Structures are given as structure tokens and as C-alpha cells.
Amino acid sequence: MSTQAIRPIALAAAFTAAIAFAGAAGAQEAGKLLVWINGDKGYNGLQKVGDAFTKAAGVPVTVEHPEDAPGKFQQAAAAGKGPDIFCWPHDRMGEWAKSGLIVPINPGKKVRDDIEETAWKAFNYQGKTWGYPVSVEAIGLIYNKALVKTPPKSFDDVIKLDKELSAKGKKAILWDYNNTYFTWPILAAGGGSVFGRDAKGEYDPTKVGVNSPGALKGAELLAGMIKNGQMPKGSGYAEMEGAFNKGEVAMMISGPWAWDNLKKSNIDFGVAPIPDVAGQPSRPFVGVLGCMIAAPSKSKDVAKEFIENHLLKVEGLKMVNADVPLGTPANKAFFKELAENPNIKATMENAKRGEPMPNIPEMGKFWSSMASALENITNGRQSPKEALDAAAARMLGK
């Protein structure tokens, strides 16, 4: 990365501000940066961006990827500790903004213009911007081209394909079905929703749609696929990834972060839209991965300089992308460079079919309530209707 990216005046101002913050309870020492990101993202590439920043500016940058990063961030930031920068999808942002764990940002015009406006909107909450968008994420159907010539358009086609492949000792599909993020597309296909909207168009947490007739159709499909042996009981992400890598399963539902391992395994794979449910398109959550500045940080201006003038530049994004694919970059110029890649195109297609994850604090109740519901559905402890009704009641505090 070019050292010219650092502007001496801005950097001097950053250090002045960092010293000013030193008296307050902070995450790290002034003039140093600690960055947290999830373990399935390109943390080694992000560290390279940090190393380039250190070389250019003399500011040490450490990148970590703790387990249960959101939980640890909440605890640490509430205690005046933790990272200076936290990179995470936008859906938890409203909760952290409301709790005072992150600070609003005011990006310059060029920074804002370089990034898709829809990505910025994901980080808007109560009239302010709370994070810098890095990439737009949407899961899709990843298929092994050696086993699937044409990806199925519907789940009816998936079930037919499973019969054909079962005769050869293979299975058609597997995904981390107890994880709401991966199963939501089939619940949303028929009209399932997390929250309704109020008269102003804002999310209304008193209007819950996880037990709507459309969501129930998707849940019944999931229960049936396990009951009828199309997918095994008790499978998770590791089982899915292992079976796909061994060629035992022809398709999986996952995101761009999975591509790198598939390339290393020399699997010729493609990405397609998630199959339809009962004639309705599956609608994945669209997440915008972004970087937020923690309220306790003593180095807020240094953090801003690092994000705006290093990480979000095409050179910085390329470092992260080379480690683990970003999927669809929010940066317009970098997306243009990658747009010829059919897997990037398919990811954008899935994003266009999907819906942004709500970013209000009540999303925490959604994730916990739906996790229990899916476990109960797939283990046969509750019928799909009982499980979804219970999830809706928990979300409403009943």
C-alpha cells in the first residue's frame, strides 16, 4: 500500500486527538489500534493492512478474531476495554449504538462517494451513521460442478436430485440448518418476516412475522427434509463443509467466506440463487460487513485515519480479499474490477433477491428465539407451528 495514502496534516491531528482521549477510560493505549473481526473473515489480510499502516504511520495495529466476538465486544466495551475498531455485519449496530458502545461517524465526501449508498444506509440508525461499509454479504447455493450440471431452481428439484444422487452414495444438499442466518431464506420465501413496519416505515418490534403462514411453509419443508432423510439430524456447519469438501454432498448453502477453502481443495464450484420454495424465491438476509469505532477507544481519530485512508482503499480491500473473499465489495471501484467473476455476480443476484437484516436492538431477541425454534423443529421436539409460535411469543416478551 502506498505511503502517500497517509496525509501528514490529518495524521498529526489524529495523534493530537489520541493524546486528548488518553485521560478517559479507553480500549487501548493512545496511538495504538486493536481491531476485532470474526474468525471466518480475512483477518490475516486485515493484519497486512494494519502492517502497512504501521510502516506508513508508525502506529502499531493488532488484529484479533475472538470467539463469540459480539458477546465479548459488548462486555469489554461496557467496561471501557476491548478493541478500538470492531468489524461486524450491520444487524447488531443499532443495539450497540443505543447502548453507547460505538460512536457515530462523519465520513468525508470522497469516502462516502466511493461506497455504494445502499451500503451506507445499512449503517444508518436514528439519523446518524455508525459504521464504514466494507462488503455486502449474501449467502447462496454453492454447488459442485462435478456432481451438478445445472443448479436446481426449486426445492422440489433438490429433492428429485437427492433421489438420483442417493443411488450413487451421495446426497444433494446440506447446510447449517439450526443457524437462523442460513435457514432464513426458505422461511422468508413465502412472506416470513422478522419485523413489520410502522406508519413512518421504521421497523416495529411489536409486529413479528416469524410465525406467518409463509414462514411456516419453509419450516415444514426443513422438517420434512430431515424426516425423509434428505438431510441428517444434528448436522452443523463443520459437517456441511466436511461433506462438501469430500464430495459426499453436491450442494451447500453458504457465503463467499467458504470459497477459499473450496479452491484449496481443488473443487470446481459455482454459486447460484438459493432454490425457490413453493414457487416463491428464497430471500436471504443481506448483511453489510462494516467497521465501527468503539466508544471507549483512546485513538478514535487514528482509527478513522486507518479505516478511511487504508482499509477502504482498493489496495487495502485487495489485501483482505486475497485472504478470504469479501464477496461483493461495497467500494464501487473494487466491485467493478471483480464484477466479471460469475460467483461475485451470483452473490449480488442473491443479495438483490434478499432483504437487509434489520438493525434495531430487538434483533437480539430474534436470533435467540429462532435458534431455539430451529433446534426444536429439526430434533422433532416441536412441530414447526409450535416452534415458530413459541419464537414469536419470546420475541414479544410473552
Language model regions located:
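Conserved N-terminal structural module of periplasmic/extracytoplasmic solute-binding proteins
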Residues: 14, 27-95, 109-112, 256, ...
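Extracytoplasmic/periplasmic substrate-recognition and gating elements
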Residues: 51-56, 129, 220, 224, ...
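Short helix-initiation/N-cap motifs at beta->coil->alpha
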Residues: 65-73, 91, 157, 232-246
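A structural signal for short loop-to-beta-strand junctions that line the ligand-binding cleft
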Residues: 83-84, 112-145, 171-172, 281-283, ...
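Hinge/lid segment of periplasmic solute-binding proteins
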Residues: 90-138, 150-162, 186, 270-272, ...
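Extracytoplasmic/periplasmic solute-binding protein
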Residues: 130-134, 139, 159-207, 249
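Glycine-centered hinge/linker elements that transmit conformational signals in sensory
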Residues: 162, 204-234
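Long, aromatic- and glycine/proline-rich binding clefts that accommodate carbohydrate-like moieties
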Residues: 272, 320-369, 376
